[in-house]
Swiss-Prot record:
Superkingdom of this protein's organism: Eukaryota
EC number: 2.5.1.-
Gene behind this protein: malE
UniProt pathway: Alkaloid biosynthesis
UniProt record, GO biological process: alkaloid metabolic process
This protein's name: Prenyltransferase malE
Catalytically driven reaction(s): (S)-3-(indol-3-ylmethyl)-6,7,8,8a-tetrahydropyrrolo[1,2-a]pyrazin-1-one + dimethylallyl diphosphate = (S)-3-{[2-(1,1-dimethylallyl)-indol-3-yl]methyl}-6,7,8,8a-tetrahydropyrrolo[1,2-a]pyrazin-1-one + diphosphate; 1-hydroxy-3-(indol-3-ylmethyl)-6H,7H,8H-5lambda(5)-pyrrolo[1,2-a]pyrazine + dimethylallyl diphosphate = 1-hydroxy-3-{[2-(1,1-dimethylallyl)-indol-3-yl]methyl}-6H,7H,8H-5lambda(5)-pyrrolo[1,2-a]pyrazine + diphosphate
Length: 438
């Protein structure tokens, strides 16, 4: 494999926002939708073009983004801060790279309305149910059963919301309950659901382990997985806390994966190794090889090691950078009738120098034999943010996730700050900017 997942043309060879410009002439927007579209759609178009999605797929996915997401990002400028990003932005674009496979572009977002965070909808429930109805109409393979079930089990209802009286997740600024993820694959769209159970734990006085056990047990016979193994380890290692969350595929329950996410401030290799191996319980060749490659990536991106000061507050330019530190995140992916979970790590690169991170990734790609991707990657990421200097910024690359199996090899995703709005003052003395959208 020499060309690598990105193909052989650089993004400078084409007009990477051509589809965005064309659609902008004909789509109709409210004032809020217009703001979100022009601040986010150009970047999505650039990412799709860089990942070699042909022009027809670019049109398809940008129209989907307009129809399913832009109308549900809430007021612009935003008022409700979403838990899905460190800045509180309710949308996040990422790209997944695998051996011998085209890159896959993904969209994560939390549906928001003008009521989100107000007394009428303090925990942002109403918009999610509307999006479920929309997806049921426009996505033939979308199955809402697990979304509806887990939201009922793991998020607060109206009575519980009233009891909480607008309180945040313990010690934080967070209130989010649900979110969605979209994988843009081969002309289709795979949908994932997310739930953030902290408020449910808070009001019910149940532990997260208790809530998850009850939810999983309620699906026995149609959604069987090795939850007990993960639950025991998460309890023992302190993996559960108020920032933990879960996700699942919005497909027939018997075919869905279930992921349990942990969040921790101990960003050290010793902790990573313990989590990756379930405290030494997982020792297969697959686990050992994955850990070896994970250590290589850890070394190349040169992540600052140590105890982080993350408390659940947003890094949104209202704090003079005091909340820039991000925690380590990981998940255990549970598949039906599979006795062992698959670990995935999310390195917290928000707050690290962007050029250092991008160059480290390029070296990792080079070591995998993804030559063209490695050669063009710094230029490609720079083209995503033409108004920014990656040598000076610290928040344009947000997360790097990594998993490994013998079947698929390296499974790596890069998550980006996904708006032309730049909230922060950089070390170069830039003023808080609004970007030009394209």
């Amino acid at each position: 494999m020499t060309a690598g997942p990105m193909g052989n043309k650089s993004t400078s060879d084409i007009d990477s926002v051509l589809v965005y410009k064309s659609l902008s002439r004909y789509l109709k927007f409210s004032e809020n939708e217009e703001g979100w579209w022009h601040k986010t759609a150009p970047l999505l178009n650039k990412i799709l073009a860089a990942a070699k999605y042909d022009v027809h797929l670019q049109y398809r996915y940008l129209v989907f983004y307009y129809a399913a997401c832009v109308s549900a990002l809430g007021p612009y400028p935003q008022r409700f801060s979403s838990s899905i990003t460190r800045s509180g932005l309710p949308v996040e674009f990422s790209v997944n790279y695998q051996n011998n496979s085209k890159p896959i572009v993904r969209i994560g977002y939390e549906p928001i309305s003008h009521l989100s965070g107000t007394e009428r909808d303090p925990y942002n429930h109403k918009t999610a149910s509307e999006i479920v109805a929309t997806l049921s109409k426009i996505q033939p393979d979308f199955d809402p059963r697990l979304f509806n079930y887990f939201v009922h089990q793991l998020s607060v209802n109206k009575a519980e919301s009233d009891v909480l009286n607008g309180a945040n997740v313990e010690g934080s600024e967070m209130k989010s309950q649900t979110a969605f993820g979209f994988d843009l694959v081969n002309g289709e769209i795979s949908v994932k659901g997310y739930a953030f159970p902290a408020m449910k734990c808070q009001v019910s006085q149940q532990s997260l382990s208790q809530l998850l056990k009850a939810a999983i047990n309620g699906l026995k016979g149609e959604f069987d997985c090795a939850f007990g193994l993960v639950d025991e380890y998460m309890e023992r290692c302190g993996g559960y806390n108020q920032f933990s969350f879960v996700s699942w595929d919005c497909v027939v329950p018997a075919k869905s994966r279930f992921k349990v996410y942990g969040v921790h401030n101990d960003v050290t290799w010793k902790k990573i190794e313990d989590i990756w191996t379930l405290g030494g319980q997982a020792t297969s060749g697959n686990v050992t090889k994955g850990l070896e490659l994970l250590k290589e990536l850890w070394t190349l991106i040169d992540l600052d090691e140590g105890e982080r000061g993350y408390t659940g507050r947003f890094d949104d330019a209202n704090d003079n950078g005091s909340n820039i530190q991000s925690p380590m995140v990981w998940n255990y992916e549970l598949r039906p009738n599979n006795p062992w979970p698959l670990a995935k790590f999310y390195f917290p690169v928000h707050g690290e120098n962007d050029m250092k991170i991008v160059k480290g990734l390029a070296r990792f790609f080079e070591n995998r034999g993804w030559t063209e991707l490695a050669r063009s990657y710094v230029q490609t990421v720079s083209s995503f943010f033409p108004d920014r200097d990656l040598n000076q910024t610290q928040r344009l690359v947000s997360w790097i996730s990594f998993a490994y199996t013998e079947k698929t090899g390296v499974y790596l995703s890069v998550y980006y700050h996904s708006s032309a709005d730049y909230l922060w003052i950089s070390e170069s003395g830039e003023k808080r900017g609004q970007g030009d959208g394209a």
